[in-house]
Amino acid sequence: MSEIFVNSIQKNKNDFAMQIAEYIKMSQKFAALKDNVFFNQKIAKAQSIGKDEALKSYDEVYFAHKKGYLIALDERGEMIDSLQFAEILSKNSQISFFIGGAYGLSENFKQKMDKIISLTKLTLAHKIAKLMLFEQIFRGLCINAGHPYHK
């Protein structure tokens, strides 16, 4: 069974928590899906100082969570459809997704990724992008399993 980690910098862990928990539950028969939420005093302080400090604090938190095939979400990333997304899931037994904080992700961090994708050309609130990512993970797992969720 594959392992999928969604890593996010998020001040309020309760945003869409019920919906995300439902996607995790529905995905259990296909993969071990984990929601890793990070926010601490160091990140809060860094964000109050400015962009460079904030990006550095995100990098430090995320460093220990780089496992398997690494994918960053970025509005300038590659646009892919659900079938291409499902193919990525099928080819990798361990995947880590990274959603940036208020200032995104550093260029240095993004350079260490195996892939950078965009969910849409629109700029989204991080909590909405995260919910969309969980839905697409579930959809991709269903596509790969021949489940009728994706019609």
Curated annotation (Swiss-Prot):
GO terms for cellular component: cytoplasm. The keyword Cytoplasm applies. Its main location: cytoplasm. Gene3D superfamilies: 3.40.1280.10. Its EC number is 2.1.1.177. GO terms for molecular function: rRNA (pseudouridine-N3-)-methyltransferase activity. It is found in: Cytoplasm. It catalyses: pseudouridine(1915) in 23S rRNA + S-adenosyl-L-methionine = N(3)-methylpseudouridine(1915) in 23S rRNA + S-adenosyl-L-homocysteine + H(+). It is an enzyme of class 2 (transferase). It comes from the Bacteria. S-adenosyl-L-methionine binds at L73, G100, L119, T120, K121, L122, T123, L124. InterPro entries: Alpha/beta_knot_MTases, RlmH-like, tRNA_m1G_MTases_N. Pfam families: SPOUT_MTase. Belongs to the RNA methyltransferase RlmH family. Specifically methylates the pseudouridine at position 1915 (m3Psi1915) in 23S rRNA. Homodimer. This is Ribosomal RNA large subunit methyltransferase H. The gene is rlmH.
